[in-house]
Amino acid sequence: ETIASVLAQKYKVKKTQGNFNNEIGLPLTVFTLEESDEIAVLEMGISDFGEMTRLTAIACPDVCVITNIGWCHLENLKTRDGILKAKTEIFKSMNPDGTVILNGDDDKLITIKDVYDKKPVFIGIENKSGIYAENIVNNGLEGMTARICNVNTADNINDFDVHIPVAGIHMVYNSMAAAAVGAEFGLTSEQIADGIANMETLAGRNHIIRTDSLLILDDCYNANPVSMKSSIDVLASSKGRKVAILGDMFELGEEEKQLHYGVGEYFKDKNIDVLITVGELSKNIAAGVRTVSACDVHSYDTKDELEKDFSKLLKKGDNILVKASHGMQFTKIVDSLEKLEL
């Protein structure tokens, strides 16, 4: 979304819609391309080896962006090294003269020294070898501000200040990636800053909903341990009573219980008032929280059971994070919260 918003400042852009990022959705997106479209921004989602090879053969990208090597899809990919191997299959059918943009703060991605004898463009906060961010200010749910700097003086972009309308440090990385792509396609610093500042959020992805009773942080499109912790940070930055409604994270393999427990331990010093979990695996989040926080903890087996207790658990003015893997269908919880009167 951030990359598409930036490129749209200069070009006619087609982007992936919803979850059309797999071996069915990607071709359907490509089929919608029109002669007037100048750039396609395509998301590629995988869960096993070989899938990225097939996707990149369809898209043949000129620019490849990998934002991190996290802890998702471990059921098939087993380890973060496996995830790295699967994601870097994207290089197989990319334009050999194209550009690779990587998160230089990621311990796995930083090991990639060249692709087709060309060095990647690294983005980072700690890594300052390419495009980096400094002077980062967290304004809670109002978003972030930062200064994005560029080491490569041959690009069109100079150092610039930017307002990032979506909270979370991950959005700083997304903004740096968008700046790197923008530089590749000849955008100016002003165009990049405008594209980032005017980015729109989608339902289920860091989307803020304000009702008469509640502020809802709808991030229920999907979840893994890295994104779950990022969303907890966003909730922690809000003002007022903080409630996290978290569900199971799928496809984590043999370490699924420990990874859920680790999310719970991440609550330490976050000053979150209430944790509500739904599902069997997320009970491990609750167990982890109890070891590090005085947070009020409640666990439910089903969404229906939880919704019956909304009036007991929630107060008017609460800030509520809703997040789980897509298969948990937490959009139903978001819909119910939107209708709730307290």
Where would I find each of the regions flagged by the language model?
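Short, polar loop motifs at secondary-structure junctions
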Residues: 104-108, 125-126, 279-283
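A short glycine-threonine-serine/GTX helix/turn-capping micro-motif
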Residues: 53, 162-169
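Phosphate-binding loop of NTP-binding sites
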Residues: 1-99, 104, 110-116, 176, ...
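Glycine/charged-rich beta-loop-alpha catalytic/anionic-binding loops adjacent to active sites
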Residues: 10, 125, 151, 155-164, ...
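Acidic-glycine-rich active-site phosphate/pyrophosphate-binding loop
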Residues: 1-4, 137-160, 205-208
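ATP-dependent carboxylate-amine ligase
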Residues: 4, 76, 88, 96, ...
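Conserved RecA-like helicase motor-core motifs
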Residues: 12-18, 123-125, 295-299
